[in-house]
Amino acid sequence: MPRLLDRQTPVHFIGVGGIGMSALARILVDRGHSVSGSDPRDNATTQQLKTLGVKVFRQQDATCIDAVTGRTAADSPVVVISTAIPESNPELQRARQQGLEIWHRSDLLAALIEQQPSIAVAGSHGKTTTSTLITTLLLEADQDPTAVIGGIVPSLGSNGHSGQGKLLVAEADESDGSLVKFSPSLGVITNLELDHTDHYSCLDDLISTLQRFAGGCDRVLANHDCPILQEHFQPTAWWSNQSDESVDFAALPLSLDGDRCVARFYEAGQPVGDFTLPMAGLHNLSNATGALAACRMEGLPFNQLVEGLAGLKAPGRRFDLRGTWKGRHIVDDYAHHPSEVQATLEMARLMVRSGRSPLPSAPQRLLAVFQPHRYSRTRQFLDGFAKALQNCDLLLLAPVYPAGEQPLQGISSNALADRVRKLKPDLEIAVAENLDQLTELVIQHSLENDLVLAMGAGDVNGLWSRLTS
């Protein structure tokens, strides 16, 4: 690993447009590396990378490697891949033929983490939001951290930033188990729940992986409100939103509205002060409490952190108001697990019920648009999705986003609709055959002042652009 970090080695990313890969590419550019990459997608991310001087190839084949390989080993790039790149990828095969040094994305992130004091955020849900909030609080406190985040940090306008401060903040993705390579100064674990069943055969496998991650951290901060963490982990410090007893940090809600949370912060059972979080939902209060606790463990004064809370915003695709179309409020959210869908719908329902929201006007109805992600995942969580999706006034379902998987017999959005109907027969549900039809269904069924909430990790986030075009 030292060759990449100690010398100005060129670096080539296969799949540079991915949210995790592009963050690392940005940081290496900031640090003076010559960076190139390939990605068949031409999107805002690849366009931004080009403006930074990154050479981006639209194809993924041997010619990309030939174009960036130097005459000597010192002139040749380190090639970075992610778990999404298969061994059959022709670009990767060419790199191996050329004898180039190949790193997994997690190896590069591990090397960056080892370089400086770092905070790595892990867990099944809330990683991106919590790491974004930590980054934002540090920025507001003039700490200027380096950040490697799985979403766009609003205060940075980017997912990657090479700061001048001493700290690095990273999102530690558990989906492929590679987070066990990380050795941060402080590990933050938001919660644990079975997910990524393509990698983990059971919950015990996931617990074991996170225990290995925790073992590599100098200190660990964990969410006491998660029963699985309570049972299987012994962190340095706990946080809670349920009680200030037997925990190191707590934020107990004083009021919850559709546009904010007001809470009292405790340390070691003693009240420290009240704060207002300009975000709705108990899950966001939990994320913010973890972020505050992490910053307190790094020695930042509470009063300074509270000042930074005023301008907090969630990362991109986390209840992201895209705009208002013909009086309909179009919101995009990355929720693609039953617990995430439930929390997001509860937050949206609170906005409708309370009449208070960050939207331009108070929404009258909640129209949920959901795109299941992967056939295997839909099969695993079919009942959980059905239960979560009841909490809306109208439900529109997009086809399953395959993410490279082949269809499974009996697993479809129609099957999900049938499960929801059994639980809530009077709920109006429509299933689209494609995204064009989904857009037409939104146009036909939505009314002025509806909150149209599009959820999923696939391409359902294109709903806004389809409506406005």
From Swiss-Prot:
UniProt-annotated location(s): Cytoplasm
Q: Which GO terms describe its biological process?
A: cell division; cell wall organization; peptidoglycan biosynthetic process; regulation of cell shape
Gene for this chain:
murC
Family membership, please give it. Belongs to the MurCDEF family.
User: InterPro entries this protein is in?
Assistant: Mur-like_cat_sf, Mur_ligase_C, Mur_ligase_C_dom_sf, Mur_ligase_cen, Mur_ligase_N, MurCDEF_pg_biosynth, UDP-N-AcMur_Ala_ligase_MurC
Catalytic activity, reaction form = UDP-N-acetyl-alpha-D-muramate + L-alanine + ATP = UDP-N-acetyl-alpha-D-muramoyl-L-alanine + ADP + phosphate + H(+)
Q: What's an example of a GO molecular-function annotation for this chain?
A: ATP binding
Q: Which organism is it from?
A: Synechococcus sp. (strain CC9605)
Domain of life here? Bacteria
Name the record gives this protein: UDP-N-acetylmuramate--L-alanine ligase
Keywords linked to the UniProt accession:
ATP-binding, Cell cycle, Cell division, Cell shape, Cell wall biogenesis/degradation, Cytoplasm, Ligase, Nucleotide-binding, Peptidoglycan synthesis
Write out the GO cellular component annotations: cytoplasm
Instruction: Return the broad EC class.
Output: ligase
Q: Where does ATP bind?
A: 123-129
Identify the pathway: Cell wall biogenesis; peptidoglycan biosynthesis
